Swiss-Prot record:
Residues 51-93 are annotated as: Disordered. The keyword Cell division does not apply. Pfam families: Mgm101p. Residues 1-23 form a transit peptide. GO terms for molecular function: single-stranded DNA binding. GO terms for biological process: interstrand cross-link repair; mitochondrial genome maintenance; recombinational repair. GO terms for cellular component: mitochondrial chromosome. This is Mitochondrial genome maintenance protein MGM101. It is found in: Mitochondrion matrix, Mitochondrion nucleoid. It comes from Debaryomyces hansenii (strain ATCC 36239 / CBS 767 / BCRC 21394 / JCM 1990 / NBRC 0083 / IGC 2968) (Yeast). Keywords: DNA damage, DNA repair, DNA-binding, Mitochondrion, Mitochondrion nucleoid, Transit peptide. Residues 63-88 have a biased composition (Low complexity).
């Protein structure tokens, strides 16, 4: 539909046509296509002010979609694989003077004074070569019960303990939790223990104990217990004197690989046998 109106003045005559055409025959309304979210574009746009200034006023007034932060995307993707027991230690809201120390967040006594000489001599004593073990991959370690015996000799049974600092973080294959080592009422060290597990949720309970033992071993490192096991020179010499690296075969898959063992042990643990 087209409408026209003619207007004249003293100087000249001007014909003005006012067009009011709603959709002409050659115009087809196309459906609105929903654009896919481009996180890379939005990230560069919101981090580069120059890209904002180059926009026109019309485009600047339109609302832009809010970018998704990295924390939100990571938390949404990992929430399906990471679990927690929600067993965070209770935190006192208003601690009072003289009240028991809350070891979940306290650092009471950390680094205040050294322990007596008789205690230090026990902690820093050289470990017996017969107490050291080696894993098939060549890693030296001291059995967890040895650490507990050294702590009992140094501080006495009941004179030390492990206090949890965080909740247990559980993934499909690993458990971790932070612990604090308390000796004679003082915080000595904080470490996060970890333990891999296989076989489903029924193995979590055993893995939790392994996680606690791993944290104890790491805390004892700050006290100097079995510090030789962290010394590369000692490790090389001890392996040369007390260990052998031999070829072994898996009894079922028949795959061959090199493994470490103690010289005093004549055989390998299942499922490997000496070639």
């Amino acid at each position: 539909m087209i409408r026209g109106t003619s207007l004249s003045t003293s100087s000249r005559s001007i014909k003005v046509f006012i067009f009011n055409a709603r959709y002409s025959s050659n115009y087809v309304k196309a459906p609105i296509k929903k654009m896919s979210y481009n996180s890379a574009f939005q990230k560069s746009y919101y981090s580069n002010p120059a890209s904002k200034n180059g926009m026109t006023n019309n485009s600047a007034t339109t609302s832009s979609p809010k970018p998704i932060s990295n924390n939100e995307s990571e938390s949404s993707s990992s929430s399906s694989t990471i679990k927690s027991f929600s067993d965070s230690p209770a935190i006192a809201s208003s601690p009072e003077v003289g009240s028991p120390i809350n070891w979940s967040d306290s650092f009471h006594g950390l680094g205040t004074a050294p322990f007596p000489k008789e205690v230090s001599d026990i902690l820093l004593a050289s470990i017996d070569n017969d107490d050291i073990e080696i894993k098939p991959d060549g890693l030296l370690y001291l059995p967890e019960i040895k650490y507990r015996r050294i702590l009992n000799r140094a501080f006495g049974p009941g004179g030390w303990g492990l206090a949890p600092r965080t909740e247990s973080l559980i993934t499909p294959k690993q458990i971790s939790r932070e612990y604090a080592l308390i000796c004679h009422g003082r915080l000595v060290s904080v470490a996060r223990g970890e333990q891999d597990y296989f076989g489903g949720d029924e193995k979590i309970t055993t893995a939790l104990e392994g996680c606690k033992s791993n944290a104890l071993m790491r805390c004892c490192k700050d006290l100097g217990i079995a510090s030789e096991l962290w010394d590369p020179s000692f490790i090389r010499k001890w392996k040369k004197d007390f260990c052998d690296e031999i070829f072994a075969e898996h009894v079922t898959t028949k795959k061959k690989k090199k493994l470490w063992k103690l010289k005093k042990n004549k055989t390998l643990d299942y499922p490997y046998k000496k070639i």
